[in-house]
Structures are given as structure tokens and as C-alpha cells.
Swiss-Prot record:
It comes from Salmonella heidelberg (strain SL476). HAMAP family: YidC_type1. The lineage of its organism: Bacteria, Pseudomonadati, Pseudomonadota, Gammaproteobacteria, Enterobacterales. Keywords: Cell inner membrane, Cell membrane, Chaperone, Membrane, Protein transport, Transmembrane, Transmembrane helix, Transport. The chain crosses the membrane at residues 6-26, 350-370, 424-444, 458-478, 499-519. This is Membrane protein insertase YidC.
Length: 548
């Protein structure tokens, strides 16, 4: 029995350590804050390019759909601001969440265009193109399902380049179509590129982190190829000039933060070069450059790419590009978190409340694990029955640890007791607990998701710490109801304070996770009583007062 309790303590400490370690691995170390200056520099060739120099400001046009509110600069056609009207900046706020931003304090842009030998975005061909637009404000009207925003540029040779943003109702994926009309007598060689650039340091208005470890998630770059489905690239790695330079057919590049992402997905059959670059001034970039395309004289060439700018909605992202849904970063336990989330989402489709969905999924998980739980308690009961024999054996053999171990194993074999039989439910519960943590911290559906009463956001900590206290109370009751053979005063004190210690740990955990643990403890109490009644009938348990 002592070993079972020690294993429980070790298991809980292990869970806490793994969460802390995951945070340490994923969080980006923040260097000393430095002032970020505005720039329109782009590394639109490869990781080694020095970038397109700044060339003056264009006009700012606005595009509004039912889910996006973008600002596009006619100089280059870059998306310099993106607001998400469906997602408030903070709980209870009327201000929309801002994903892309261009201010003196912070840069986060989605850049794109045509480079290559004859591309207007090639630095060797002069300033970036200044596109013409028919109006400065575009709005997706009621009843309209698609909105096109065409931008045109004609170079000195009379070649016309058209860049058209295509928006669809309810969609965070924006197609960017290019048309190149060759008015000259020689072929034009152009390549599409897409680049995401961002300031490494977060200003106060962008920093949604916290001083506690339970609320930090990965912020950085990522890419995908047919060979590497999902690879993260930290901002500080790019800032240290440890740059990516990969050629691939298909795939995507992205920048990630908790719940939201931007990504460029090239749409071509050729090879793309994926790169990262340190652009200076505290700004880093990840992007792609497509294989060159030749447009013959008198002909028109067409190319396209897709920009994702919005929340990390798994099913929608998966429909846009293979493995794009993996940007919902569930950590190393993704293979558990993903099925859990699918089950949770299915339950939510019936009950309509994420908190009640968590309660139901807890009952389902614990119900599936009931045979193992019963085996655990049976093993623990048999171990208690053997304690007098084990104690007598220890007294008889004294300090001969080797003989103690040999005779103890022989005793277990004779009595058909597995000393580790009570560990399996604990081993199974640990990854489930961690997977649920990742799921709560990574699923946009649970952001600002209310439960009941004072719990208005299941992804955030309980503002009044009521749930952690209730968790500690349930843990205390489980401890008091469980038989023990602990006689060492120090171990007794440690076990007595375990509910208090873990209540403190859980103060900063997401309330949805604490809710899961409370319900799991309540299920444990119920199952405990049912199992004890069964064990009483077999003579393996008695209702005598628990030792303290």
C-alpha cells in the first residue's frame, strides 16, 4: 500500500513536471526589448536574399467580409493589418482580436508578390510595384458569397501585372491570383512568393502571456513538406541566423501563436523554396519562393497562392492544405489530444456547453477505465492483506535486503499478487491528463468558452480559485476514505499535505482542466465505494476506521 501511495505522489509530480517542461520547450525566450522600426523589407528570393528595399508608402485600402477586416498596402499589395470580428481581443471586450499589425511598436505582415528575373518585386527591377485599385474600400455585401479585390500594375515596358485577392463568406483562406500579360518581344520569367514577417519582441498590448507556467504556448514559425508534416522553427533560432532553406513540392509556411495562425500555401506543381531570414531591426521572416514560370510574348500567365489568416480551426485548415491543421499544437501527446477533442466536439454538438461536455467526457473516460481501476483496488487490497506477512518477514531477515527481495517476490507469486498491478490506471491517466491540458490550451473552440456561474472562460484559470479548492477537497476525501498502512510520521505528514500542495499547483491551471479533475475525483469516490463493497464480499476489505 505504501508503494501505491508513493506512486500516486510520483505520478502527480510527474504530470506537473511534464507540463512545466513542455512550457519551457515551447516558449520563446524574450531578449531585451528594443524599439522596432517600420519597414517594407522583404526577403523575397531565398533565405540568402538581402530583401526588397523600402520604396515609399502606397495607399491603404480596406477589405471587410463577415469574418475578416483587412488593410492592404497598394505598394506591393501586402496585408498590413488583420482584424478578426468574430473573436474579441479579451473576454467581454467589443474590440476585435488583431492578428496582423503594422505600427512603430510592432510589425506582423503577410507579404506576397512576383519576384524572379522579370518580377516587379525583384529588387533589381526597382521599387516594389505601386498597384492601382478602383476604390479604397471593399465590402462583402449581404447575400454576396465572394468578393474580389483586383490590383493592377503596368511596368515601363508595358507588361501588366494583376494581383487579385479573392475572399469567400465565412472563410479565413484568401486566394491570391496573379495574371501576367507579356506585351514585349521576350519571355518574362516570374516567380510567386509569400512571406510572413514579425517582430520578435512583443509589446505590452500584444503580450497575452502570464507569469504562471500554465498559460504559455508556442509562438514562432512552422513549415510543412511531404517529408516533414509539421516542423516548428523558433523566432530566436531565426534571429540567430540559423536559417531554413528547403526545397519541396507542396507544403506551406506559417507563423503561429496561441489559437491563431497565418500561413502561405503555394498552389503550383513545381518546386518551392522554403526559407527563413533575419531581416534586422528585431524582425524575422519565413516564406516561400516558387519555381520560375515563363510567360511568352503576347501571352498571359496565371499563378495563384493561398493565405490563411485567422483562428486555428482544425477541420477548415485541413481542407485548405494537408497537415495545416497540425498548427493546432497539441504537443507530443497529439495522438491522444486529437481524438479527445473530436469526441469532445461531438458531445458539444448535442449539449451545447463545453463545460458539460468536459464532464461527460470525464465519465466516458473513467467508465472505460473502470475495469483497470477495479483491478488496481483489488491489487491494493491484496497487498494490504499481505502486510502482516511482509512485516514479519522483514523482522525475521533484518538488514538482508537481497533475501527480503527474493522472499517477497516468492510471496507475491504464491499469493498471485502483482505488486505493480495498481499502477496501470495511474500510468494511463497521466497522458490523458496531459493531453487534455494541451487540448484546452490549443483549441480555439475553448477560448472564452463559458461553463456556468462564475466560469466564463474554460481555457483560463478560475478567477476566484473556487474550482482548485473544490479539487483539493475531493482529493482530501479520497485520501481519508482510502485504507493505509503508513506508520512513518513523516510520510503521514506528506500525505496529509498532498491535497494542499496540489491545490496550489492547480490555482493557475485552466478551469476546464480543473473541472475535469474534480469530476474525475468524484467518479473515483463513487467507484471506490462500489469496489470496496465488492471486496468486502470477498473478504479483501473491511470498514474498520482508517489508520492515521
Amino acid at each position: 500500500m505504501d508503494s501505491q501511495r508513493n506512486l500516486l505522489v510520483i505520478a502527480l509530480l510527474f504530470v506537473s513536471f511534464m507540463i512545466w517542461q513542455a512550457w519551457e520547450q515551447d516558449k520563446n525566450p524574450q531578449p531585451q526589448t528594443q524599439q522596432t522600426t517600420q519597414t517594407t523589407t522583404t526577403a523575397a528570393g531565398s533565405a540568402a536574399d538581402q530583401g526588397v528595399p523600402a520604396s515609399g508608402q502606397g495607399k491603404m485600402i480596406t477589405v471587410k467580409t463577415d469574418v475578416l477586416d483587412l488593410t492592404i498596402n497598394t505598394r506591393g499589395g501586402d496585408v498590413e493589418q488583420a482584424l478578426l470580428p468574430a473573436y474579441p481581443k479579451e473576454l467581454g471586450s467589443n474590440e476585435p482580436f488583431q492578428l496582423l499589425e503594422t505600427t512603430p511598436q510592432f510589425i506582423y505582415q503577410a507579404q506576397s508578390g512576383l519576384t524572379g528575373r522579370d518580377g516587379p518585386d525583384n529588387p533589381a527591377n526597382g521599387p516594389r510595384p505601386l498597384y492601382n485599385v478602383e476604390k479604397e474600400a471593399f465590402v462583402l455585401a449581404d447575400g454576396q458569397n465572394e468578393l474580389q479585390v483586383p490590383m493592377t500594375y503596368t511596368d515601363a515596358a508595358g507588361n501588366t501585372f494583376t494581383k487579385t485577392f479573392v475572399f469567400k463568406r465565412g472563410d479565413y483562406a484568401v486566394n491570391v491570383n496573379y495574371s501576367v500579360q507579356n506585351a514585349g518581344e521576350k519571355p518574362l520569367e516570374v516567380s510567386t512568393f509569400g512571406q510572413l514577417k514579425q517582430s520578435v519582441n512583443l509589446p505590452p498590448h500584444r503580450d497575452t502571456g502570464s507569469s504562471n507556467f500554465a498559460l504559455h504556448t508556442f509562438r514562432g514559425a512552422a513549415y510543412s513538406t511531404p517529408d516533414e508534416k509539421y516542423e516548428k522553427y523558433k523566432f530566436d533560432t531565426i534571429a540567430d541566423n540559423e536559417n531554413l532553406n528547403v526545397s519541396s513540392k507542396g507544403g506551406w509556411v506559417a507563423m503561429l501563436q496561441q489559437y491563431f495562425a497565418t500561413a502561405w500555401i503555394p498552389r503550383n506543381d513545381g518546386t518551392n523554396n522554403f526559407y527563413t531570414a533575419n531581416l534586422g531591426n528585431g524582425i524575422v521572416a519565413i516564406g516561400y519562393k516558387a519555381q520560375p514560370v515563363l510567360v511568352q510574348p503576347g501571352q498571359t500567365g496565371a499563378m495563384t497562392s493561398t493565405l490563411w489568416v485567422g483562428p486555428e480551426i482544425q477541420d477548415k485548415m485541413a481542407a485548405v492544405a494537408p497537415h495545416l491543421d497540425l498548427t493546432v499544437d497539441y504537443g507530443w501527446l497529439w495522438f491522444i489530444s486529437q481524438p479527445l477533442f473530436k469526441l469532445l466536439k461531438w458531445i458539444h454538438s448535442f449539449v451545447g456547453n463545453w463545460g458539460f461536455s468536459i464532464i461527460i467526457i470525464t465519465f466516458i473516460v473513467r467508465g472505460i477505465m473502470y475495469p483497470l481501476t477495479k483491478a488496481q483496488y483489488t491489487s491494493m487490497a491484496k497487498m494490504r492483506m499481505l502486510q502482516p506477512k511482509i512485516q514479519a518477514m522483514r523482522e525475521r531477515l533484518g538488514d538482508d535486503k537481497q533475501r527480503q527481495s527474493q522472499e517477497m517476490m516468492a510471496l507475491y507469486k504464491a499469493e498471485k499478487v502483482n505488486p505493480l498491478g495498481g499502477c496501470f490506471p495511474l500510468i494511463i491517466q497521466m497522458p490523458i491528463f496531459l493531453a487534455l491540458y494541451y487540448m484546452l490550451m490549443g483549441s480555439i473552440e475553448l477560448r472564452h468558452a463559458p461553463f456556468a456561474l462564475w466560469i466564463h472562460d474554460l481555457s483560463a484559470q478560475d478567477p476566484y480559485y473556487i474550482l482548485p479548492i473544490l479539487m483539493g477537497v475531493t482529493m482530501f476525501f479520497i485520501q481519508k476514505m482510502s485504507p493505509t498502512t503508513v506508520t512513518d510520521p513523516m510520510q503521514q505528514k506528506i500525505m496529509t499535505f498532498m491535497p494542499v500542495i496540489f491545490t496550489v499547483f492547480f490555482l493557475w491551471f485552466p478551469s476546464g482542466l480543473v473541472l475535469y479533475y474534480i469530476v474525475s475525483n468524484l467518479v473515483t469516490i463513487i467507484q471506490q465505494q462500489l469496489i470496496y463493497r465488492s471486496l468486502e464480499k470477498r473478504g479483501l476489505h473491511s470498514r474498520e476506521k482508517k489508520k492515521s
